[in-house]
Amino acid sequence: MNTAYIGRFAPTPSGYLHFGSLVAALASYLDARAVGGRWLLRMEDLDPPREIPGAQDAILRTLETYGFEWDGELVRQSERHAEYAAVIARLLSQGLAYACTCSRKQLEGYAGIYPGFCRNACHPDHDAAIRLRVPELDYHFIDRVQGEFRQHLGREVGDFVIRRRDGLFAYQLAVVLDDAWQGVTDVVRGADLLDSTPRQLYLQELLGLPQPRYLHVPLIIQPDGHKLGKSYRSPPLPADQAGPLLLRALRALGQQPPTELQGAAPAELLSWGRANWDAMRIPRSRTLAEAQLR
């Protein structure tokens, strides 16, 4: 096994896996396995109020039904709260983060860019969100599919939340710490997270953590213009359609499975995918229309 490549799939149990999830899982799986790399599974269960009972078990069953095999033990973010809290305490003590008591109503009209109301205040950090101070700098990276991506953190994002006011830890912090802890070298995920990457680069730099390579695959868009996702009640992956949907996902990723694989079992499709994977064939687009993939 090639330990120089470590990839991962990190679903959230706020719903079941859908076709968009399958495309992301397949891309990350094949990108790792094609070079003999490791593929890890992490459950991003940071938000218990949004978690659907039974979703974690359903996600695991679906991955197994579709032929995915992961390395090592399943990691749950809910088991790593102490690590997140320790880093936040460090950032606060260094003046790199601060407590914010702004309400959603106060922030209406700012287009999601924090205006800095609490930046120079001295609020206690209980009953407050914790925000990370961001520099007035332009961050950029080369995505393996999407190419160069740039974002000015100060103008386009503002100081961002790393712990919510209700005490729940934010995705941006947890994903950076977990990727580093697990030794992830390659992050392959949906293009909806492209905009988050500069924030993660900044956190990696601030904490002295290694920077993985990034590859963002196109999102699958429904006819109404919404992405396939849990928020829009996209249909879960059916157990009896694993072969046809894997074949469709391969094509969505620009791979060219031969016609004789029509009707093939998941194991055969994944074997072909490992042997023939070419990330350069992935469409250089942030979105793909679901209707075009049928």
Swiss-Prot record:
Protein name per its UniProtKB record: Glutamyl-Q tRNA(Asp) synthetase
Keywords of this entry: Aminoacyl-tRNA synthetase, ATP-binding, Ligase, Metal-binding, Nucleotide-binding, Zinc
Motif ('HIGH' region): 11-21
GO cellular component: cytosol
Cofactor binding notes: Binds 1 zinc ion per subunit.
Family annotation (HAMAP family): Glu_Q_tRNA_synth (MF_01428)
Alphabetical GO biological process terms: glutamyl-tRNA aminoacylation; tRNA modification
Record bears the keyword Aminoacyl-tRNA synthetase: yes
InterPro entries recorded: Glu-Q_tRNA(Asp)_Synthase, Glu/Gln-tRNA-synth, Glu/Gln-tRNA-synth_Ib_cat-dom, GluQ/Sye, Rossmann-like_a/b/a_fold
Function statement: Catalyzes the tRNA-independent activation of glutamate in presence of ATP and the subsequent transfer of glutamate onto a tRNA(Asp). Glutamate is transferred on the 2-amino-5-(4,5-dihydroxy-2-cyclopenten-1-yl) moiety of the queuosine in the wobble position of the QUC anticodon.
Residue numbers binding L-glutamate: 8-12, 44, 171, 189
Binding locations of Zn(2+): 100, 102, 114, 118
E.C. designation(s): 6.1.1.-
Pfam families: tRNA-synt_1c (PF00749)
Obligatory cofactor(s): Zn(2+)
Positions that bind ATP: 230
GO molecular function, one term: ATP binding
Motif window: 'KMSKS' region: 227-231
Family according to the record: Belongs to the class-I aminoacyl-tRNA synthetase family. GluQ subfamily.
